[in-house]
Amino acid sequence: IGSFGFVTFYHKDYKEADDTAYKILQITDVHILNDEKKDAKVYKTVKNMVETTKPDMIILTGDLTSEKENFTAFKSFCSFLEDFNIPWGFTFGNHEGLDIAYEKNEVLDPEKIADRQTLSDYLESLSNCIYEAGDENVDGTGNYYYNVTDDNGKVLTTLIMMDTHSWDKENNGYDHFHDNQIEWYENTIKSIAKEVNGDESKVVPSLAFFHVPMKEYMTAYEEAKGTDNRLWGYRFPNEDGTPAVDDMMFEKMVELGSTKGCFAGHDHMNNFSVMKDGIRLTYGLSDDHNIYLTPLRGGILINIKNDGSFTTQHLIRHRGQNTITIGKEQ
């Protein structure tokens, strides 16, 4: 597979995967910038994916917009998602803040510009958005969870949404999960196990969604080359936006045994998916038309099964094409 991963895609009419109880569409890095022509391409791609696959939920893993006039763009895309009238979740990326784009003493228009807290409050006001700001004593904005249940109310899987912050000035690189977030994650997993199964050691399957990928994404990619551990998708050479430090979050996931899949964004040119230590590490596909000339845009369809397991399918919109290519179930 050389410097790249691989995946077999094929054109076909969409058919729901067998034994699917719940479908989630992951989208990421849409970077709405109030550019009517470019933004329209994002809206069209997302609308096409939703109408084709009819997901039960949409999760956007960060970088909905960038810093300049972010509130205008943010509200526009949120309104668009609300109109699908299905639940949708959100995790903050590294571009929703204001510290990069504006001078310290610059006068900002509150109707057009917003800090993270204002964006968080806005998300919580929306009727279809499941976002929660989370515990104020835990670092980050938007550490929360959502239980997916079957028709009888049985919890099939827990969706863990977490904030990976923005820039780590101390280590001069992208930020990571902080210690009290990892503690929150552990407490959440054990609390759900106790509530659902009466024993905190009997964990419920979970999937984690966040923006900046853990360092293990790159480790897993390198370890998989030349082995039977099949790589799905694509890695752009030297595209590595993982954190500056190892935060030990992955080790905690392995220790607890609940989280079976992680879904990140951030690295616009990467969309690979690979197994490591029993956890599927998956990049979403960037839908950005403003920052990078990404050749493949689209999303990841997550098919949660009746036993709590899951599969994924890449949904691809090739540059210059209006149709969606449906990937094989993985």
Model-derived features with residue positions:
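Active-site neighborhood of phospho(di)ester-bond hydrolases with catalytic His/Asp-centered motifs
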Residues: Q26-T28, I58-D63, W88-N94, A208-F210, ...
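Active-site environment of divalent metal-dependent phosphoester hydrolases
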Residues: L33-E36, S66-E69, F90-Y102, W167-E170, ...
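Binuclear metal-dependent phosphoesterase catalytic core
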Residues: Y145-G153, M249-L256, N270-Q330
